From Swiss-Prot:
Chain residues that bind K(+): 226, 245, 247, 250
Keyword Lyase: no
Name this protein carries in UniProt: tRNA modification GTPase MnmE
HAMAP family listed in its UniProt record: GTPase_MnmE
Example GO biological process: tRNA methylation
One Gene Ontology CC term in the entry: cytoplasm
Residues given in the record as (6S)-5-formyl-5,6,7,8-tetrahydrofolate binding sites: 23, 80, 120, 454
Role summary: Exhibits a very high intrinsic GTPase hydrolysis rate. Involved in the addition of a carboxymethylaminomethyl (cmnm) group at the wobble position (U34) of certain tRNAs, forming tRNA-cmnm(5)s(2)U34.
GO MF annotations in UniProt: GTP binding; GTPase activity; metal ion binding
Organism: Salmonella typhimurium (strain LT2 / SGSC1412 / ATCC 700720)
Quaternary structure note: Homodimer. Heterotetramer of two MnmE and two MnmG subunits.
């Protein structure tokens, strides 16, 4: 498929609605207007017109908007037809447009891809369009809009410019070694490098917040049967999401709930009670429980406080702890404090967090909520943030690593050439975020996740 083709797609969600929009972009958009509308509308003015079939009969009537390139979303000629939102009507109009030579259905995200290729958006802004559509909270939506308006890109571009300036100094020190001022040893380059590292650390902190807003945190509730796992799921979700009985093994499959804690998405997973099961269905449920545990960001180790006084997970169930993935964070949740009379709250035991609560009464649930938020480093007071994806975090981490290696070369051996190379690599990593240096394969993966009409 060529970027010279003219593309068309429905820009509104499928199904019935008051308004349905078809978007056309490319060189043939002008021909589509002449054929379907009988005229070329005045640029950027709403024109109420009939939408005509091949024989001249009306298929629908509605608003036509004409945006000649380069002053359009894609940078190409763009025509938008806003008609009635019935699927049959839109399908008839789409088929009519596709009868014209050189016009084809758009690939997912192709409109945004063309906007990127025509320098109307950088890659981070293009990704923000999809993130804005998929936002699951008000805070995520606001942060996605900030990214779309260039907040994230501006921070990255500032770092790139600072690195460019620093590289000039380093290259000058390499190319003109006989000058009176030795830029490598007089401390100026070190001071500038430290400034860039500090700025990058600040951006990484904000990016981690943005990633939490977008990705959320996956928390798996695990433990023995009848420890109160399903009751905890219901308490966190604020509704009866799981069946709760006194019968051991009631939960046999994985149950998922998605909630928000001050804007941070939390993916809670209730699992089957872990034990040696003879029942085939329960055994499969336990296998799935372990699969979820291995992919978790944190495990809530649920303990029935009426069965043991132990608080160290290694003492409570050593075989369970031994099987957990290395470095997986664990929070021990001692349940049924309403029965045992334990003091509600949170403490630390041998490097693990310990929360005492009652899932049945809801006492102590707020303590657990705050603990989950703090354990991920989520800051609800951070204003003007932006959303970030995992690839952004990886690129920022790579840039930080190159800068630290460059600093080591500078202070350890005054190796200007090696410092210059590390600065170049750091700059390249940052430029991957905005798409200045990005492989075609990565671009294809990013835009293929978009809506068809975007």
């Amino acid at each position: 498929m060529s970027h010279n083709d003219t593309i068309v797609a429905q820009a509104t969600p499928p199904g019935r609605g008051g308004v349905g929009i078809l978007r056309i972009s490319g060189l043939k958009a002008r021909d589509v207007a002449q054929e379907v509308l009988g005229k070329l509308p005045k640029p950027r003015y709403a024109d109420y017109l009939p939408f005509k079939d091949v024989d001249g009969s009306a298929l629908d009537q509605g608003i036509a908007l004409w945006f000649p390139g380069p002053n359009s979303f894609t940078g190409e000629d763009v025509l938008e037809l806003q008609g009635h939102g019935g699927p049959v009507i839109l399908d008839l109009l789409l088929k009519r447009i596709l009868t014209l030579p050189g016009v084809r259905i758009a690939r997912p995200g192709e409109f945004s891809e063309r906007a990127f290729l025509n320098d109307k958006l950088d890659l981070a802004q293009a990704e923000a369009i999809a993130d804005l559509i998929d936002a699951s909270s008000e805070q995520a939506a606001r942060s996605a809009l900030n990214s779309l308006q260039g907040a994230f890109s501006a921070r990255v571009n500032h770092l790139v410019e600072a690195l460019t300036h620093l590289r000039i100094y380093v290259e000058a020190a390499i190319d003109f070694p006989d000058e009176e001022i030795d830029f490598l040893s007089d401390g100026k380059i070190e001071a500038q490098l430290n400034g860039v590292i500090a700025d990058l650390d600040a951006v990484r902190t904000e990016a981690r917040q943005g990633s939490l807003l977008r990705e959320g945190m996956k928390v798996v509730i695990a433990g023995r049967p009848n420890a109160g796992k399903s009751s905890l799921l219901n308490a966190l979700a604020g509704r009866e999401a799981a069946i709760v009985t006194d019968i051991a093994g009631t939960t046999r499959d994985v149950l998922r709930e998605h909630i928000h804690i001050d804007g941070m998405p939390l993916h809670i997973i209730d699992t089957a009670g872990l034990r040696d099961a003879s029942d085939e269905v329960e055994r499969i449920g336990i296998e799935r429980a372990w699969q979820e545990i291995e992919q978790a960001d944190r495990v809530l180790f649920m303990v029935d406080g009426t069965t043991t006084d132990a608080v160290d997970p290694a003492d409570i169930w050593p075989d369970f702890i031994a099987r957990l993935p290395k470095n997986l964070p664990i929070t021990v949740v001692r349940n049924k404090a309403d029965i045992t009379g334990e003091t509600l709250g949170i403490s630390e035991v041998n490097g693990h967090s310990l929360v005492r609560l009652s899932a049945r009464t809801g006492e102590g649930i707020d303590v657990l909520r705050n603990h989950l938020k703090q354990s991920m480093g989520f800051d609800t007071n951070m204003e003007g943030g932006f959303l970030a994806r995992r690839r952004h975090l990886q690129a920022l981490a790579e840039a930080a690593e190159h800068l630290e290696q460059g600093k080591a070369q500078l202070l350890g051996a005054w190796a200007g050439e090696l410092l210059a190379e590390e600065l170049r690599l750091a700059q390249q990593s940052l430029s991957e975020i905005t798409g200045e240096f990005t492989s075609d394969d990565l671009l294809g993966r990013i835009f293929s996740s978009f809506c068809i009409g975007k």
